Swiss-Prot record:
Protein name, as recorded: Small ribosomal subunit protein uS19
InterPro entries per the UniProt record, alphabetical: Ribosomal_uS19 (IPR002222), Ribosomal_uS19_bac-type (IPR005732), Ribosomal_uS19_CS (IPR020934), Ribosomal_uS19_SF (IPR023575)
Highest taxon of source: Bacteria
Annotated signal sequence range: none
Organism: Vesicomyosocius okutanii subsp. Calyptogena okutanii (strain HA)
Primary gene name: rpsS
Lineage: Bacteria, Pseudomonadati, Pseudomonadota, Gammaproteobacteria, Candidatus Pseudothioglobaceae
Record keyword Transcription regulation present: no
Role summary: Protein S19 forms a complex with S13 that binds strongly to the 16S ribosomal RNA.
Keywords from the UniProt entry: Ribonucleoprotein, Ribosomal protein, RNA-binding, rRNA-binding
Pfam family, one: Ribosomal_S19
Length: 89
């Protein structure tokens, strides 16, 4: 179910403050965040946001194709070790 257009996209307050400050200072340092639920907004384009995946912060470089998606979509939480070979006798 989509979010109402009347409400607008959800972005944690502390994250949007850091984004606006980084844009004002032209700071290229990655912004660390645990907020996987925040939506990528146009103000984030060109910045690098380090999204926590449960273990480490994964650096995500934001481009215009990511607008409207959630930050958590770009930081994979599970590691796939691969399927083992054929074990049939």
């Amino acid at each position: 179910m989509a979010r109402s257009l009347r409400k607008g996209p959800f972005v944690d307050e502390h994250l949007i403050k850091k984004v606006l400050a980084a844009q004002g200072n032209n700071d290229r340092k990655p912004i660390k965040t645990w907020s996987r639920r925040s939506v990528v907004v146009p103000e984030m384009i060109g910045l690098t946001i380090a999204v926590h995946n449960g273990r480490v912060h994964v650096p995500v470089s934001i481009n215009e194709n990511m607008v409207g998606h959630k930050l958590g979509e770009f930081a994979i939480t599970r590691t796939f070790k691969g399927h083992f070979g054929d074990r049939k006798a």
